[in-house]
């Protein structure tokens, strides 16, 4: 399952290297002020937003893609926060019940994976419920694709099948393991088998006892019990590893969903602060860098606006086709951002 809320065709890379001048760039733009307003003391929102801003996206299609998703977020802020809270719950629940999944023994790995997948099944059902209840109010390509995927892949039939298989893998009636004889008559190729369904009582009474080969280990035969335990572990080892990998896959999905939602949570926090100050916001129309299109009305310094108690005065510019701009610093005494620009076209 893919998230794709930052890019149309790939995940957001939280490990991507920052620009060589990231520190100086952050200081010049006073990003700490902006990031503080975005994060509201959420460390993940702070880190993801910092990387998203410093690793500047210049692809017009990617920018428009994110703008559509952000517009959905602004129309449905409570839904976005509900999604983010659900991802946080998933990560926290994973921490609490993952002690077995990292164990050395297949039986412990199997037990831990079953417990974790049962928890995740409930969380995935709740996630799909959010998509079903609110999908009609989201129109962006990113959220439309995400919600469609959740509704398609997490159907009631699928989740019921998962629950049934997890219940069966608890092996309450013991483990049926097959093996072949290898060199020295040692058991090899141990495989966990699904036992046949038991016949009804009347059938068993009519057929009578069935012949079988069996043996019983003495109560104090520790070596025999240990040998049986090892054979059982060899049989369930492939299944335990497969379940653990499935749990890891779901953890990765919730982790990436949390990471990419964190950026939009930061945008929501910032929008609330601007709205509280009565400051205008907009979605600019991006164009390719070589178009030299520079037109804006009421542009103001966001960080200055966040730090000043009073309002700030915006600036208007019509500078299409200009190549050079000289921008002065902020005039805080006059409570305004001074935007001085001169331009000349190179021959």
Residue ranges and their predicted role:
Residues 1-178:
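Conserved amphipathic alpha-helical "coupling/scaffold" segments
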Residues 2-14, 260-333:
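Conserved NTPase motor "head" modules and their coupling/switch loops across ABC/AAA+ ATPases, GTPases
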Residues 176-178, 293, 324-326, 345-346:
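Structural motif
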Residues 201-206, 319-322, 342-344:
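Glycine-rich loops and low-complexity Gly/Arg-rich segments
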């Amino acid at each position: 399952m893919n998230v794709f809320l930052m890019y149309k065709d790939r995940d957001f890379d939280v490990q991507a290297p920052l620009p060589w001048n990231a520190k100086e760039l952050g200081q010049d733009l006073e990003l700490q002020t902006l990031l503080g307003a975005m994060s509201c003391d959420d460390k993940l929102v702070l880190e993801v937003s910092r990387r998203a801003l410093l690793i500047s996206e210049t692809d017009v299609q990617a920018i428009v893609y994110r703008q559509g998703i952000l517009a959905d977020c602004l129309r449905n802020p409570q839904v976005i926060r509900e999604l983010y809270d659900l991802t946080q719950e998933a990560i926290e629940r994973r921490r609490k019940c993952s002690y077995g999944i990292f164990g050395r023994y297949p039986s412990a790995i199997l037990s831990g994976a079953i417990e974790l997948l049962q928890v995740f099944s409930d969380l995935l059902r709740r996630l799909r419920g959010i998509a079903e209840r609110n999908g009609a109010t989201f129109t962006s390509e990113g959220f439309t694709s995400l919600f469609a995927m959740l509704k398609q892949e997490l159907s009631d039939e699928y989740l019921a099948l998962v629950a049934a298989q997890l219940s069966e893998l608890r092996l309450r009636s013991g483990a049926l393991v097959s093996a072949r004889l290898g060199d020295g008559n040692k058991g090899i190729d141990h495989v966990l088998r699904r036992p046949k369904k038991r016949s009804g009582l009347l059938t068993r009474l009519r057929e009578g006892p069935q012949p079988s080969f069996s043996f019983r280990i003495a109560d104090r035969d520790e070596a025999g019990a240990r040998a049986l335990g090892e054979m059982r572990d060899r049989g369930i080892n492939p299944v335990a590893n497969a379940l653990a990998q499935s749990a890891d896959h779901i953890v990765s999905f919730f982790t990436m969903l949390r990471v990419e939602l964190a950026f939009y949570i930061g945008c929501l926090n910032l929008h609330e602060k601007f709205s509280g100050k009565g400051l205008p916001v907009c979605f600019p129309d991006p164009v390719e860098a070589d178009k030299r299109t520079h037109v804006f009305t009421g542009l103001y310094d966001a960080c200055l606006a966040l730090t000043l108690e009073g309002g700030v005065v915006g600036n208007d510019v019509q500078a299409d086709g200009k190549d050079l701009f000289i921008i002065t610093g902020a005039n805080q005494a006059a409570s305004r951002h001074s935007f001085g620009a001169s331009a000349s076209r190179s021959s």
